[in-house]
A protein has these predicted regions:
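Residue-level signature of catalytic and energy-coupling elements of molecular machines
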Residues: 15, 67, 180, 264, ...
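Short, acidic (Asp/Glu-rich) active-site segment that either coordinates a divalent metal cofactor
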Residues: 66, 157, 170-230, 234, ...
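Glycine-/charge-enriched secondary-structure boundary and capping motifs
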Residues: 2-11, 120, 124-131, 135-138, ...
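N-terminal amphipathic/basic leader segments beginning at the initiator methionine
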Residues: 2-37
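Glycine-rich phosphate/pyrophosphate-binding loop regions near the starts of catalytic domains
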Residues: 28-189, 285
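Hydrophobic face of alpha-helices
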Residues: 23, 122-125, 196
């Protein structure tokens, strides 16, 4: 290039000094997630975690999971509320491996952002650290990737990765599910982290850029209390963090509860997740009467579904419908498992039952 001139990394938009300040800002919150197996601290080329504790298991099976938060982040950016999306990230990963009965051991995060600002980054990572503490796993590493010229300064995306362990004899397996089994549900906090592409259409945030007057006006609108939500605002209801079910479920399983398998209800709703926990010759019959489910649905899900004029089947394959986690148990164990869950502070309810079939989810009002 004949007209070339000296250009630094900072000239290109990457502020390594601010990146260093961001690392300093999160060091203590990361350290606070440590388990005894963690070796060293952040800053190395890899996160170190001792496997010595696995020697007490008969046949330890490592289970990994990775996921993101999706377009819920668009709403967080418009509202300038970043403290809880990290919990969403952790939940999406650890709840997935919990479905096999695995205990999450450690977690890593990846943040892609247009411009790193230490205070902003600390808010995001605080949510990740809080989620790790709720799940009992260590945050052993991560990456902050600044993407100047590719992403707008305030834009960011999150991805996470977790590794857990379960002893093979205790691993949950859909093959254990039989006709007659009962499906129990644990409540969600709301929409959790799936269905936000539809939510964005309903609340009219598509095309609005964070930090603009349009974003400020929309944030004010979404902060108004709504009677349909019991006085809560759409912003509060839609940004409620995804529940992390790890500690009560692991305590339940360690107590010997005879759970056949578990389904984490995420993208695709009940219809496209509960089937993943079924044996090939079993169907799940979910209790429903038209638009009414057999349990209480969070008002925000009902509100969005009505605004979008979703048919019941469409709603059930878009949203969790108030069910964050399903546990499948034998009918003779339903009362004992329910009692144990209540003792752990949970509020279980019956979602449906299993019948002979071909691995599908069907609804009672369509049989």
């Amino acid at each position: 290039m004949s007209d070339s001139k000296h250009v630094t990394y900072e000239d290109a938009g990457v502020d390594t000094a601010e990146g260093g300040r961001a690392v300093d800002a999160i060091k203590q919150m990361v350290k606070d997630t440590n388990r005894p197996e963690v070796i060293g601290g952040i800053g190395g080329f890899g996160g170190l975690f001792s496997a010595a504790a696995l020697k007490d298991m008969e046949d330890p099976i490592l289970i990994s999971g990775t996921d993101g938060v999706g377009t819920k982040l668009v709403l967080a950016q418009i509202m300038d509320r970043h403290e809880t999306v990290g919990q969403d990230l952790v939940a999406m990963c650890v709840n997935d491996i919990l479905a096999s009965g695995a205990e999450p051991l450690f977690f890593l995060d990846y943040v892609a952002i247009g411009h790193i600002e230490a205070g902003h980054m600390a808010k995001i990572i605080k949510g990740v650290a809080d989620g790790c503490k709720l799940a009992g796993c260590a945050l052993v590493g991560g990456e902050m990737a600044e993407h100047p010229g590719v992403m707008a300064p305030a834009d960011y995306d999150l991805a996470g990765f977790t590794v857990g362990v379960v002893d093979r004899p205790k691993m949950l397996d859909p093959a254990n599910v039989r006709p007659g089994d009962v499906i129990l549900g644990l409540p969600s906090t709301g929409v959790h982290s799936n269905g936000y592409s539809l939510v964005r259409k309903v609340i009219g945030v598509d095309g609005i850029k964070p930090g603009t007057p349009e974003a400020a006006a929309k944030a004010e609108e979404l902060s108004r209390p709504l009677e349909e939500l019991g006085g809560a605002s759409l912003a509060d209801a839609l940004l409620a963090p995804t529940r992390i079910y790890v500690k009560p479920i692991l305590e339940l399983l360690r107590g010997g509860a005879p759970v056949h398998t578990i389904a984490h209800i995420t993208g695709g709703g009940i219809t496209e997740n509960l089937n993943r926990a079924l044996a090939d010759d079993v169907d799940a019959v979910v209790t429903r009467n038209g638009a009414e489910m057999g349990w209480d649905v969070p008002p925000v899900i009902t509100y969005v579904s009505r605004q979008a004029e979703l048919a019941p089947n469409e709603a059930c394959k878009t949203f969790n419908m108030g069910v964050g986690l399903c546990l499948i148990v034998a009918p003779e164990d339903e009362a004992a498992v329910t009692e144990a869950l209540v003792a752990l502070g949970e509020k279980p309810f019956r979602v449906g039952e299993c019948v002979e079939g071909s691995g599908k989810v069907v609804y009672s009002d369509e049989r």
